[in-house]
Amino acid sequence: MLKMEINGGVATPTASAVAKVTETTTPVNSPSPTSSPPPPPSPQQPPQPPVVLSPCAACKILRRRCADKCVLAPYFPPTDPAKFTIAHRVFGASNIIKFLQELPESQRTDAVNSMVYEAGARMRDPVYGCAGAIYHLQRQVSELQAQLAKTQVELVGMQLQRSSLLELIYNMEQTKLSVQEQGQQKMSFESSFESGDEFISSPDEESNDLGFLEDNNNNNNSSMSWWDPLWT
């Protein structure tokens, strides 16, 4: 129904009533057939797993609230509480935080590992600590260097023995070859000498030749003796 206001005996509709009437009488625009279809609904993204914020091992041991930008959180995870326990016993939490704040982030990991190692060495050897471990390692290095030098000397000696043995074998082979060559030369010389003897007469033939000459001399003497009286 329209609400009417009476002004001087004349009923006039109110503004709210007129607005309602215009809304009901306004035709609804139907989508034109040439309009583009609505975009397909985007696939629903899987729900993100809830992030469980767990305090780091340092804050858990110290029983304090772990802040978002905790200096100790990246280096002492909650899964390894013994790491912070060892360092905390020797250096203390305040000193560890102070050391880390004085260093750039690129060197903090090495610093934490060094503090944990030194704290463990101090707990194992309260007197010398890390220096004792370094001393033992240096002594091992010296012993290994001495063994290496000894092995190198032995290796040089074995190489010299090998070279001398090879030289001895070479000399023996050369001597053997020279002996064989001399034997072959001797055999060839003897064979050539024997072949040359075929052209030399034997002693019997020489004696026969000499006998023939003696016979000739005797005949000549006999003939001369026959002619001797004729000339006397």
Swiss-Prot record:
Q: Which PROSITE patterns match?
A: LOB
From the UniProt entry, list the residue stretches annotated as the region Disordered: 1-50, 181-218
Q: Name one Pfam family in it.
A: LOB
Disulphide-bridged cysteine pairs = none
Q: In which tissues is it expressed?
A: Expressed in young shoots, stems, leaves and flowers.
Where composition is biased (Pro residues), the residues are 34-50
Against InterPro entries, the record matches this protein to: LOB (IPR004883)
Bias category Low complexity: which stretches?
Answer: 188-202
Please report the stretch or stretches of sequence annotated as the LOB domain. Answer: 54-155
Q: Which family does it belong to?
A: Belongs to the LOB domain-containing protein family.
Could you tell me which PANTHER family the record lists for this protein?
Answer: LOB DOMAIN-CONTAINING PROTEIN 11, LOB DOMAIN-CONTAINING PROTEIN 4-RELATED
Name this protein carries in UniProt = LOB domain-containing protein 11
This protein's species is Arabidopsis thaliana (Mouse-ear cress)
